[in-house]
């Protein structure tokens, strides 16, 4: 805790000293956004589930997907019709080296059918795992369903998009998201913010 006025042999703290101390005491939480994505699973908790088929129809789990330090898990609306998701995916392909050097494998998950994910892989030349969230079981398990859409709407089942850094044991190390789905975290900011425990 920062003390504004300190009585000591040196006398009261000066304004300059106070400003320096204030700057040093600022933590990342000071700048944290009010929006809390996936609030049921805060940083430090364990993910509830990760088991889904990839773009090749092969069943994947956290164990099969993890790099040395875990995975970067990205929940998206759709790579079929969502332009913001497509742009984010393209940016991730360009930024993938920054995460691979951190020992992280990249994993994305959407409700898109496996056939669509395979086309996305080929058309966008994606070189990492695209998972199909069958029956939106992951979106429901993580409690990140976008409730703007009713059952029967083509977009029903999409999540509030976001990113998790998950270690090989399933522990959430960091989360990144924006409240407005049209805005996505910048990949360079995400890479700079990641600290490997």
Roles of regions detected by a PLM:
Residues 16-29:
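Bacterial N-terminal signal peptides
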Residues 33-63:
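N-terminal "domain-start" segment that seeds a small globular fold
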Residues 65-86, 90:
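Short active-site neighborhood of thiol/selenol oxidoreductases, capturing the structured segment around
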Residues 86-136:
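Structural microenvironment flanking redox-active thiols in thiol-disulfide oxidoreductases
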Residues 121-160:
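Short, internal strand/loop/helix patches
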């Amino acid at each position: 805790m920062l003390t504004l006025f300190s009585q000591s042999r040196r006398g009261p703290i000066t304004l300059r000293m106070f400003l320096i101390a204030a700057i040093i005491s600022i933590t990342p939480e000071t700048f944290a956004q009010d929006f809390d994505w996936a609030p049921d699973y805060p940083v430090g908790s364990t993910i509830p589930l990760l088991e889904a088929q990839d773009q090749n129809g092969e069943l994947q789990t956290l164990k099969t997907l993890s790099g040395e330090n875990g995975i970067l898990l990205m929940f998206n609306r759709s790579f079929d019709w969502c332009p913001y998701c497509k742009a984010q995916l393209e940016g991730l392909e360009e930024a993938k080296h920054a995460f691979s050097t951190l020992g992280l494998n990249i994993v994305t998950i959407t409700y898109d059918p496996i056939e669509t994910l395979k086309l996305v892989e080929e058309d966008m030349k994606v070189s990492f795992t695209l998972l199909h969230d069958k029956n939106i079981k992951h979106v429901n398990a993580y409690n990140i369903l976008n409730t703007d859409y009713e059952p029967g709407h083509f977009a029903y089942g999409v999540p509030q998009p976001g990113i998790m850094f998950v270690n090989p044991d399933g522990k959430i190390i960091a989360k990144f998201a924006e409240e407005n789905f049209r805005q996505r975290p910048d990949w360079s900011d995400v890479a700079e913010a990641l600290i490997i425990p």
